[in-house]
Amino acid sequence: MDLEAARNGTARRLDGDFELGSISNQSREKKKKVNLIGPLTLFRYSDWQDKLFMLLGTAMAIAHGSGLPLMMIVFGEMTDKFVDNAGNFSLPVNFSLSMLNPGRILEEEMTRYAYYYSGLGGGVLLAAYIQVSFWTLAAGRQIRKIRQKFFHAILRQEMGWFDIKGTTELNTRLTDDISKISEGIGDKVGMFFQAIATFFAGFIVGFIRGWKLTLVIMAITAILGLSTAVWAKILSTFSDKELAAYAKAGAVAEEALGAIRTVIAFGGQNKELERYQKHLENAKKIGIKKAISANISMGIAFLLIYASYALAFWYGSTLVISKEYTIGNAMTVFFSILIGAFSVGQAAPCIDAFPNARGAAYVIFDIIDNNPKIDSFSERGHKPDSIKGNLEFSDVHFSYPSRANIKILKGLNLKVKSGQTVALVGNSGCGKSTTVQLLQRLYDPTEGTISIDGQDIRNFNVRCLREFIGVVSQEPVLFSTTIAENIRYGRGNVTMDEIKKAVKEANAYDFIMKLPQKFDTLVGDRGAQLSGGQKQRIAIARALVRNPKILLLDEATSALDTESEAEVQAALDKAREGRTTIVIAHRLSTVRNADVIAGFEDGVIVEQGSHSELIKKEGIYFRLVNMQTSGSQILSEEFEVELSDEKAAGGVAPNGWKARIFRNSTKKSLKSSRAHQNRLDVETNELDANVPPVSFLKVLRLNKTEWPYFVVGTLCAIANGALQPAFSIILSEMIAIFGPGDDTVKQQKCNMFSLVFLGLGVHSFFTFFLQGFTFGKAGEILTTRLRSMAFKAMLRQDMSWFDDHKNSTGALSTRLATDAAQVQGATGTRLALIAQNTANLGTGIIISFIYGWQLTLLLLSVVPFIAVAGIVEMKMLAGNAKRDKKEMEAAGKIATEAIENIRTVVSLTQERKFESMYVEKLHGPYRNSVRKAHIYGITFSISQAFMYFSYAGCFRFGSYLIVNGHMRFKDVILVFSAIVLGAVALGHASSFAPDYAKAKLSAAYLFSLFERQPLIDSYSREGMWPDKFEGSVTFNEVVFNYPTRANVPVLQGLSLEVKKGQTLALVGSSGCGKSTVVQLLERFYDPMAGTVLLDGQEAKKLNVQWLRAQLGIVSQEPILFDCSIAKNIAYGDNSRVVSQDEIVRAAKEANIHPFIETLPQKYETRVGDKGTQLSGGQKQRIAIARALIRQPRVLLLDEATSALDTESEKVVQEALDKAREGRTCIVIAHRLSTIQNADLIVVIDNGKVKEHGTHQQLLAQKGIYFSMVNIQAGTQNL
């Protein structure tokens, strides 16, 4: 009876929109064939309560589904009563009160039928509520479990698995793929059972009431079913491909947003946008093909449906005329079968959601079931109460799983006695850090053994083993929480006193106490609020608080400035007492006190002994020391004499300089410090309030270039909508034929109407295909456009926007993935349905008023109730959608952080802690799903039951109008079917309410992003583009605070000048504003007062793209992209195509060429996520090559050599010296030996210049610089 059902069912695209989350390439090859799990396996995480919910939900869905066919029995009997009485009411009105009063009999009969209808309505009201709410409840409970299990499974995996999988993809799986499962196991399953029950009940009623007609109709239904099956198969293939393309796009976006400073500094926005658009374009093409194939099958389905009407009416009329059936019987059979067949169409979106869920679950469950070889959650293995700490590596061979063909360790042998300190030295990439990772059992060696106290570490319990070990690595990772919490990650049950003790030992207490919120200061995303030195000291405190038996220091002091280093080194020396310590250091001055120094070369240890023994050997260590001391020799000689005088002063500088090691900023800019989550929530709520709602037309305007598609699509939709009232007219005419009259005339009329039905079928084939295709294509184009615009708008924003915690990488990636898809959910195919349904109801109402205005008015008075139910549903679901989104983002943030920094989480054995935080954040979304279940259940059941009640009212009132001669029976049928079918169609349109609610919210977010004017617009073409630039830079009384922590002053009237071709060195304690100078020069921010001038022109007046193109930057922790080495180097100049020769030349200048040539794929070698496949030194040299390729006028070196080992440092330093020739250069360095030759050295303290001059002049002043050199020379010349 309800054409819409089929249209809606077959056409409705899943609103989850086949989003991100591909299967990585390697696994995609293997999984081409089998990428669905069994249908029942999908529910493997349901407990008895869920099963009970699902069972009751299914039972009620079946009861609900049987309602319509049962109603058709009542309808058939009622039709017979009407047709039998039709002759009695063709007289004028005043005759109707005859002796027998057939009118009263008819009205009594109708009252009885009205009770039947109402009874069915009451049953449906209850059943529909239980069906929807119980299935939604069960899904919410299971999804919570799946999220927990999946996150648990990820945290459980070993490092080699992450190297191959890549972390970005896991984040998209955690959000998108699980919401796909949620789509496939919730209310849609209930709807599916409801549809199936309708199908079976319809056919059972059909067979009982008239098997001959049923068989005829079934023949065509079978063909229809077959075509649907074929279509579903084609569709799922396209969905798979589309998923993969979107996942790749998602990974590009996440990578670019995570490295936004690098992207902006090198003007890589367009390149990132192109990479992103390339994957989107693929997804769009697949989406359009999907729309074409889907809508051809849609058209065929409608052609078959109308053909079956034609056949059924023709054959049915023959049976009625030959008195085998009554007309009521024929109607019951026809409509029962029709409703049954259409219910299959209604099941389509559910059928669609199910394979999607099974596909997503295949990957998710696969990861959940993957048992790692090294399982940190396992309880198995030896758990000693304590260990002595004797370590031994015997004949250890190893290569990383992701690059199995490159051997790192080639037979390593090393013994470390309990309490000894062993230093590993050697060139970048020789296997030192690998040794440390193997000792923590992040990987297992391919051959050989590693033992502690004579026990193979594989026999220890993994967690227990790691708890004995404290690690401080070169680029320490802090989590986005408070300082105290970060230290607590070292050991869960630590007290505040122990934290303070550890912080004092790590020399971080003073700077923490100067922060406004002290230990409650938030450190920002990846610790971005703090300087490198401050992060490093907090990481040391975090390691010390574990009180580990074995301490692993991988370049633990490389990021510190001189003063901090001396003190932290002292702290580490103290921390090493009584512990077995392995130190990796490039600065050899820090390891000369080690008990044993082991020289690494090419994956084996070639020499070991104490400092003096190895110097005598004149081997690799001797060579490294020689290279290093040549730099610091000058320092130490100058100070031999003065050191004795200075000893008493202890190197304390004037102005209490040492007391003010306070770092406001750097490396990454400040993100504001907020102590408590609830304040954060208040702000997020404000953010939502500040996003102005967007009108629907504004979204459509984005699609305006596709207007021809919309015109064609809308015309077809209107034509399709008008089909239904046309159907009503023919139906009422056909019923009227069977009153008293000549059989031959009846047969002729029936034949004619059957042919009309066939004509409607041919018409609907074309209109349905065109409607679906035009809107589908426009929708795909819109999604691509929105994603592309959103990504472009994000890349356009200024740094202060990215500093805001609401715009963390995780949150932005999630937005990008879901918002555009949700907007498409309310446009595209959905728009076509709304146009079609509106036309349907509109035409229906007009015709109804013509044929019977009284009944029309009664029926129309019911429609507002249905509409109100729809609006209430929409409003409540929208509120839920908003809350859901926000709360899932909070959980997503924790997950993203844990997955991105998995090494740190694992080293700290904090997997359980992150898991419990994540689980806690899932409570909110779960509570929402419970609330939603009930609201959705109530509104759904009201809209479902209304139809039954309207049948009761309509036919009772209809009989009154017939008895009183106001209407004929066929007009009652016409009016009723036109209005009810139209209203049902509108009901279907309102079932998209949740999608529309989500879409409006997403559209509002997107438009607020598109319309945000950044303070510094990276895309701007405004400003001057000077023809030549000499390279002189002046800072004039510059005052600056970071926007997100406006109350902490950073620069307080800084003035400095560097002339063309000069090298300026900035020195000072951590946090004095050195890196801020570089960021202001790059125009990441603008000063609050004062000016920055380039060649005398104010930076604000210069075009920002031109300005950045003149600067080449190399920072302390360089970020590389997950592509080939060649592409990473070429990234330095995105304004043109860089030739391979230039890439090789830059690599040679940066001294990385020889290393690249040793790799199997040379320049085409992928560097891994954030460059993880390379050592610190290798990454740094690629970053230098990247800066040189753009031939900058000004070179900015922010700690460019701090991460390098001696040999690399010497060579890179030479490369930098060569690169500086003829260029203006600004260097930030903690190692003073690297800057002695600078033309000008400026000492910054508290945001102002305190001293400036050459190395010699500053030594003569005996001020801050003198103290710093003194301290450093002291450590170097022990």
UniProtKB/Swiss-Prot annotation:
ATP 1 binds at R403, G429, C430, G431, K432, S433, T434, Q474, G1176, G1177, Q1178. InterPro entries: AAA+_ATPase, ABC1_TM_dom, ABC1_TM_sf, ABC_transporter-like_ATP-bd, ABC_transporter-like_CS, P-loop_NTPase, Type_1_exporter. Its main location: membrane. It catalyses: ATP + H2O + phospholipidSide 1 = ADP + phosphate + phospholipidSide 2; a 1,2-diacyl-sn-glycero-3-phosphocholine(in) + ATP + H2O = a 1,2-diacyl-sn-glycero-3-phosphocholine(out) + ADP + phosphate + H(+); a 1,2-diacyl-sn-glycero-3-phosphoethanolamine(in) + ATP + H2O = a 1,2-diacyl-sn-glycero-3-phosphoethanolamine(out) + ADP + phosphate + H(+); a sphingomyelin(in) + ATP + H2O = a sphingomyelin(out) + ADP + phosphate + H(+). Translocation activity is inhibited by the ATPase inhibitor vanadate and the calcium channel blocker verapamil. Translocation activity is enhanced by the addition of the bile salt taurocholate. Residues 54-356, 710-998 form the ABC transmembrane type-1 domain. Phosphorylated. Phosphorylation is required for PC efflux activity. Phosphorylation occurs on serine and threonine residues in a protein kinase A- or C-dependent manner. May be phosphorylated on Thr-41 and Ser-46. Glycosylated. It is found in: Cell membrane; Apical cell membrane; Membrane raft; Cytoplasm. The modification Phosphoserine is found at S24. Glycans are attached at N88, N94. GO terms for cellular component: apical plasma membrane; clathrin-coated vesicle; cytoplasm; Golgi membrane; intercellular canaliculus; membrane; membrane raft; plasma membrane. The keyword RNA-binding does not apply. Interacts with HAX1. May interact with RACK1. This is Phosphatidylcholine translocator ABCB4. It comes from Rattus norvegicus (Rat). The lineage of its organism: Eukaryota, Metazoa, Chordata, Craniata, Vertebrata. The gene is Abcb4.
